[in-house]
């Protein structure tokens, strides 16, 4: 990994950029800006950005088998029609918690849309604790609730053999694993596979590479780290020129590039002067490892 190159490919100034997803069909990167209520699509060939504004904070976006997208908006799972710039509600969660919203979400290998909730923050990572839960939206639009008492539901992905579900509840400062049943979507036997060190700060978004290793974006840590979930060891750290790194995914040709989102929420003018690319989209090349294609929602 000696020839790593990091560049800000899009100075988007996201308040809180999140949920990067590569769309191979259009050579584009999808991502959201949560408080700005925007879903964005950056064309890597033309460098143009299209944006769709929705009516509530949008925390994740994913591919839909129809060629359109699904997204978590407020506390709703929604189908997103890009051409019409409209969202249709598929299901709603946390009806009894008016201060909650969805956070990170991702589609599993069977086409279910997993996403978790959290209380709305009063400042970055400051919120009423234990208010969130983890859910999945099945292809028939029914919702399964896995567990509650979540602080900040965050990064998630699945092992290459589809037998393990990896999950982050940010304020536990841990990357956890569950046994995962592909057929039923059931998860069980929760355990920690990595505890973050102090300088790594808060674990946020996560993705898996083609070797089965996990990459975790560290909020306030200004880095992505590569972990071996079997040994529990950190294998590599890539530092970025911004502190508030939020999530990561692989994309580009053969999924050989990594894209990283970040935030500028809560930064003072001095901090923004020091980190003018905060809120931008970063591309990392030369990692020497590839990712895998994202799954599409099957509903």
Swiss-Prot record:
It catalyses: D-glucono-1,5-lactone + H2O = D-gluconate + H(+). Keywords: Calcium, Cytoplasm, Hydrolase, Metal-binding. GO terms for biological process: intracellular calcium ion homeostasis; L-ascorbic acid biosynthetic process; positive regulation of ATP-dependent activity; regulation of calcium-mediated signaling. Its main location: cytoplasm. It comes from the Eukaryota. Its cofactor is Zn(2+); Mn(2+); Ca(2+); Mg(2+). The modification N6-succinyllysine is found at residues 144, 244, 253. GO terms for cellular component: cytoplasm; nucleus. A divalent metal cation binds at residues 18, 154, 204. It is an enzyme of class 3 (hydrolase). Its EC number is 3.1.1.17. Binds 1 divalent metal cation per subunit. Most active with Zn(2+) and Mn(2+) ions. The physiological cofactor is most likely Ca(2+) or Mg(2+). The active site is at 204 (proton donor/acceptor). One of its GO terms (molecular function) is calcium ion binding. PANTHER family: REGUCALCIN. Belongs to the SMP-30/CGR1 family. Gluconolactonase with low activity towards other sugar lactones, including gulonolactone and galactonolactone. Can also hydrolyze diisopropyl phosphorofluoridate and phenylacetate (in vitro). Calcium-binding protein. Modulates Ca(2+) signaling, and Ca(2+)-dependent cellular processes and enzyme activities. This is Regucalcin.
